[in-house]
């Protein structure tokens, strides 16, 4: 495969941008315009995988000679696998989510799609990460939400910040999966496209 230098992150997420920056690559950001609501999916894996693929495909269709990276994440409780946990958007919803998930285990299904249409390269997959919340008091929840305001975060926490203090344990092979962009897997596929890392 010839050397491909144009990389596009198909995302408007500041967290995914910060993760991508860790790789030290030159890339651009283009926000895809897709419908992110469930389309009959009954499992978080199916929804996250479809959204990651569609985000990358919408941008790839416009830039077929570029490597396009799409990612999406869906959270769900282990005991309620068909009930997706979205972004809270308000302080009240964030506090309610944390109260409901206190002492529970959440799984994060993170979809990743890497596409280079000109060469026919396309890999779309799911990575998982689990967190077990401590039993949280109402005062802890209120202090956390007031301090960090995780209103755009599925599950109502930022693990890269103070949110780490809410957990009893974490389980997964790549913590960046929990943050929304599995870098270990992404690097594997970028190397297949002759992107030098490191």
UniProtKB/Swiss-Prot annotation:
Origin: domain of life: Bacteria
Main EC class the enzyme belongs to: hydrolase
Entry-linked Gene3D superfamilies: 3.90.950.10
Entry EC number(s): 3.6.1.9
Cofactor(s) this protein cannot do without: a divalent metal cation
GO molecular function, one term: nucleoside triphosphate diphosphatase activity
InterPro entries: ITPase-like_fam, Maf-like
Keywords of this entry: Cytoplasm, Hydrolase, Nucleotide metabolism
Gene Ontology process terms (BP): nucleotide metabolic process
Pfam families associated with the record: Maf (PF02545)
Record localization: Cytoplasm
Major location (coarse): cytoplasm
Active-site residue numbers: 72
GO cellular component: cytoplasm
Reaction(s) the record says it catalyses: a ribonucleoside 5'-triphosphate + H2O = a ribonucleoside 5'-phosphate + diphosphate + H(+); a 2'-deoxyribonucleoside 5'-triphosphate + H2O = a 2'-deoxyribonucleoside 5'-phosphate + diphosphate + H(+)
Regions that span the bilayer: none
Protein role: Nucleoside triphosphate pyrophosphatase. May have a dual role in cell division arrest and in preventing the incorporation of modified nucleotides into cellular nucleic acids.
Protein family per UniProt: Belongs to the Maf family.
HAMAP family, A to Z: Maf (MF_00528)
Protein name: Nucleoside triphosphate pyrophosphatase
């Amino acid at each position: 495969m010839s050397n491909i230098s144009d990389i596009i992150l198909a995302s408007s997420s500041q967290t995914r941008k910060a993760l991508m920056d860790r790789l030290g690559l030159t890339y651009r950001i283009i926000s895809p315009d897709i419908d992110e609501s469930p389309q009959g999916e009954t499992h978080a894996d199916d929804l996250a995988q479809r959204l990651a693929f569609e985000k990358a495909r919408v941008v790839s269709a416009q830039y077929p000679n570029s490597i396009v990276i799409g990612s999406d994440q869906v959270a769900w409780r282990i005991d309620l696998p068909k009930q997706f946990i979205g972004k809270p958007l308000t302080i009240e919803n964030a506090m309610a989510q944390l109260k409901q998930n206190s002492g529970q285990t959440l799984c994060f299904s993170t979809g990743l799609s890497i596409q280079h249409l000109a060469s026919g390269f396309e890999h779309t997959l799911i990575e998982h990460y689990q967190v077990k919340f401590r039993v949280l008091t109402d005062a802890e929840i209120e202090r956390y939400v007031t301090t960090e305001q995780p209103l755009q975060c599925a599950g109502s926490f930022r693990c890269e910040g103070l949110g780490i203090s809410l957990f009893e344990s974490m389980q997964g092979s790549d913590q960046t999966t929990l943050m929304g962009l599995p870098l270990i897997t992404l690097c594997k596929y970028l190397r297949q496209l002759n992107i030098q890392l490191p």
